[in-house]
């Protein structure tokens, strides 16, 4: 069946914040099996799209928006098998799955950043936005959305990295093809 070009106009969306939606195992944290257990109820509401806040591996500095593993589900939310089951059951009910997939930045615990910050000449050195100090201080006066400077100094490199949000969320240098391609591949894998 061919999908209408403007299908998005007909969506009735229900947003789920997984952490607080439905706990399936009694640990006090909502999870993917919990969401799965409520699909019949959500379907009865008449929704045709489920919007999920981040469920990827994250140290959770910013409620999952600081992703350290784009191809892994956060342990407290379940497994990739749980994810696959949720998607399959949603699709059986005619429910599209929309995800918050953060591609502007990663966690400072992501393997790319851990390598990038070690030196100026490693294979991942330009994966993030780095700048030299200006007169011994931040490169400019840009502010973070969360307050304070948008720049954080890393002694190993002798440079500042840019973070629009938390200092735990360094911005990716998306102008580089070798960054956009792996990021695009992560998008396609879902």
Features from the language model and the residues they span:
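Acidic/aromatic-lined carbohydrate-recognition and catalytic surfaces
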Residues: 2-175
């Amino acid at each position: 069946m061919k999908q209408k070009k403007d299908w998005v106009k007909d969506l009735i969306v229900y947003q789920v914040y997984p952490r607080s939606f439905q706990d399936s195992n009694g640990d006090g944290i909502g999870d993917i099996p919990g969401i799965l257990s409520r699909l019949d109820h959500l379907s009865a509401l008449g929704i045709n799209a489920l919007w999920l806040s981040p469920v990827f591996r994250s140290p959770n500095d910013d409620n999952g928006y600081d992703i350290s593993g784009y191809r892994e589900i956060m342990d407290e939310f379940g497994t990739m098998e749980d994810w696959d089951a949720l998607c399959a059951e949603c699709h059986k009910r005619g429910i599209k799955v929309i995800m918050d997939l953060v591609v502007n930045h990663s966690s400072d615990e992501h393997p790319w950043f851990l390598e990038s910050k070690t030196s100026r000449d490693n294979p991942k050195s330009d994966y993030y936005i780095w700048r030299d100090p200006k007169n011994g201080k931040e490169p400019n006066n840009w502010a973070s959305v969360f307050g304070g400077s948008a720049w954080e100094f890393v002694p190993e490199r002798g440079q500042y990295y840019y973070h629009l949000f938390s200092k735990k969320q360094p911005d990716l240098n998306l102008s580089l093809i070798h960054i956009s391609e792996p990021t695009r591949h992560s998008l396609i894998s879902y």
